[in-house]
């Protein structure tokens, strides 16, 4: 006690001992001080008839702050109310002025009770013993909400709750000078919206990250590098590989088939079969658009580029007579729905109306159905896919996080370009839900799962009895798009379309091909470097290995190619790239 009194004495606290508790004492104190606080024992002794306002901890006459009731929790809460009353009195306000919400309130904290066993209170006789107190305290389940963390590999990877992550993202966006250390986390989010679904309060990290990307692009704070390859791929789809034609024999069409850039890159045979089927069984003409819906630019936060892409598609649709778009990709359908003058429908709904084609695979199998991020919140698409799978005699095994709560495969939001480690963890999360083969209705999901070594198939592969390339590399994907365009132009519209060919042979070792795919170096990039080599002759030869190396600056990237000369061409044994510019000394 003496130690406590001494410590309080250093805080400008005065003590008066042996005072007689009378109303006169309270009057004297009030004349000397702005605010007087008294315990209920003092109030009952001096003013036995007084009844303080328990909500304000205040006695109007005489003006005293008091009224703490019995109990530890009541006393703690009473002290908080009394402190607020003192603050109001010190400001010459009435204690009831602008106090806000006080007392017991309904918490927004959600705590899952999955796996929690019910337990009864430890009985005690008056006071707990040490052992009893420990046992009673051990019953606490440490209430907390981590529903989003459990569901999202992105949040688990950075080990941060959304509130903290949002604050750090805000700081990253707001700083003018200094390092933007949160760029990679901002770009690693798949923007899939799963967190909003699983969060009891609907917190949406996807919206936070998307707005951050848009803001940083607009203010020039977001470098192009993390998304440049994906954006260039989108531009390729809507330039060299782009095709927009009405059905043969029609000037305008009632429908147009839009398979999306991933299906044309991974499963061109499926696109061809689906288009021929739709043309044969739908009246009014079915046009075809091979291209990208533009979501890649939207994911990258490049609003201007996204709007330019929308304008390109709108122009193509107007030339076809503004037909209903039959989409083979839920993300394309969701993106194209945002165009004011378009009407979209999923090919799965169309197949429900016209029935399955004769060559549909009728092979009973057990599958795990992975719902696409693009179909989140779209019950019609999810239900149509399940009915279509049932008609194909697929038995769908239940999985956690399905439907609207389905996780992203790692392609959405361009995660696989910005942070491959997170994208790999996302794919693993998806595949950990079942050991069965995976059935998808998004070709990007099918490709991601195949790259992780899991048997996977797109539902249209079953519908049309076709098979996609197992895991086409980035160069093969571009070749597939061009090849499909060339084939359809020749077969249906009798038009010629020629690839750009180099006048020499280029071969690749298996190691070089794998490294190029991993480093996102296209065979067309290598061809350009070697074409420039033949013009300049600039290369360095390692006489011990016989390997030469040359380089060229293409756009924002410098490519280095290791090669050996062979008959009429080159054998590429390695390649890498960087963003430094190599300039000759002046």
What are these regions (language model features)?
Residues 2-28, 33, 37-188:
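Ferredoxin-type iron-sulfur electron-transfer modules and their immediate structural context
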Residues 2-19, 159-342, 480, 485-490:
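Iron-sulfur-cluster electron-transfer modules
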Residues 34-35, 254-256, 323-324, 366, ...:
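Structural motif
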Residues 369:
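Hydrophobic alpha-helical positions that pack around
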Residues 140-148, 152, 189-195, 199, ...:
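Short cysteine clusters
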Residues 471-473, 478-479, 483-586:
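Ribonuclease/tRNase effector modules and their secretory precursors
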Residues 262-348, 376-390, 397-486:
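Cofactor-cradling patches in redox/metallo enzymes
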Residues 107-122, 149-169, 197-215, 299-304, ...:
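Iron-sulfur (Fe-S) cluster-binding segments and ferredoxin-like electron-carrier domains
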